[in-house]
Amino acid sequence: MKIALDAMSGDFAPISTVKGAIEALEEIEGLQVILVGKEGIIKEELKKYKYDTNRIEIKNADEVIVMTDDPVKAVREKKDSSMNVCIDLVKEKLAQASVSCGNTGALLASSQLKLKRIKGVLRPAIAVLFPNKKDSGTLFLDLGANSDSKPEFLNQFATMGSKYMEIFSGKKNPKVALLNIGEEETKGNELTRETYALLKENKDIDFYGNIESTKIMEGDVDVVVTDGYTGNILLKTSEGIGKFIFHIVKESIMESWISKLGALLVKGAMKKVKKKTEASEYGGAIFLGLSELSLKAHGNSDSRAIKNALKVASKFIELNFIEELRKTMEVE
C-alpha cells in the first residue's frame, strides 16, 4: 500500500512528519510512503535515519499552505503546495490515501474539489474516533466540515457513521445517537428536532435517541452525530479541558515533597491516562463521504501522531473502506 504524506504541513514539520513516516515503516508491513514537499529539506531530514529506500519516495512540491492562508484561495493559487500535490497523487491513483496536518479548510476544499464525493453523498463530514469508558471507541461526526447543516445532512452522517463502525471497528448494529441538550424527543432547536424525526425512520441505523454531552464518553453509543459548528466546538473544548486538567494536576504535584512522592506512586497510571486521552493516539480524522481517502492529522502532531495517522490510513486501505461505504451510500 502507498500513502502520500504532506511532509511540510504542521507545527513540527518536516521533523515530525519524516520521523513519523520512518516509525510507521517499522510497524506497518507492506507500507510505502511518498513524502511530499521541498525535496532538499526532506532529504536532509532523511539523513538522520536508516530505512529501506524502496519504501520511501520523495515528490517535490515547492509551496506550503499555512494555517493563516484563506482555504479556497490557497487551494487555487498554491497548486504546487505539498497538500495539493498529496491530493493529486490520490486522484491520479499514484497513492491510495493522503495524510496531512495542514490547514483543515484548505485540505477539505482540495479534497472535495479533486476527489469528489461518493455518488449519493450530500456532504462529507469530518469523523474522529474518541476514547470512551468501555475502551470501545465512539465515532463523532461532523467535527467541522459543515458549519451550516440541514437535517438530511445529519441523517446521512448517521448512516455513514454507522457503516464506519461496522467496517472499521467490526461493530454489529452500532448504536447511533444525536447530540442534544436533553434526551427527550422534543428537546433542542429546529435542526435537532427535524433530524430526530428522520433518524427515527432511518432503517440503516440502530437509533439510540438523543444524548447529552455529559454522557458521550460513557460508551453506551457507538456513533454521535451533530452539525459541524457544534462538533468543532465540542472537539476543541474537550481538548482544552484535557490540557487544563493535566496542567492543574502537574501544578498540584509540584506543591510539596509529599505530593511529589505520591506522584511517583501513580506515575504509571497517569501515563496510561495521558496515552488514552491524547489526540496523537487516535491518528487522523477522515473526510467521510469522499470517493478516495483523505485524512487530517492534528496541526501539532508529533512523530507518534503521524505514525498513528499512517496506521489508520493503512487500516482503511486494508479494509477496502471506501468501496464498502460506497455500497451503502450509492443505493440510498
Curated annotation (Swiss-Prot):
InterPro entries assigned: FA_synthesis, Phospholipid_synth_PlsX-like
Record's catalysed reaction(s): a fatty acyl-[ACP] + phosphate = an acyl phosphate + holo-[ACP]
Record keyword Chaperone present: no
Entry's localization field: Cytoplasm
GO biological process, one term: phospholipid biosynthetic process
A GO MF term: phosphate:acyl-[acyl carrier protein] acyltransferase activity
Annotated TM spans: none
Gene3D superfamilies in the record: Isopropylmalate Dehydrogenase
PANTHER family assigned to the protein according to its UniProt record, in alphabetical order: FATTY ACID/PHOSPHOLIPID SYNTHESIS PROTEIN PLSX, PHOSPHATE ACYLTRANSFERASE
Similarity-based family: Belongs to the PlsX family.
Function of the molecule: Catalyzes the reversible formation of acyl-phosphate (acyl-PO(4)) from acyl-[acyl-carrier-protein] (acyl-ACP). This enzyme utilizes acyl-ACP as fatty acyl donor, but not acyl-CoA.
Quaternary structure (record): Homodimer. Probably interacts with PlsY.
Protein's name in the database: Phosphate acyltransferase
Gene name linked to the record: plsX
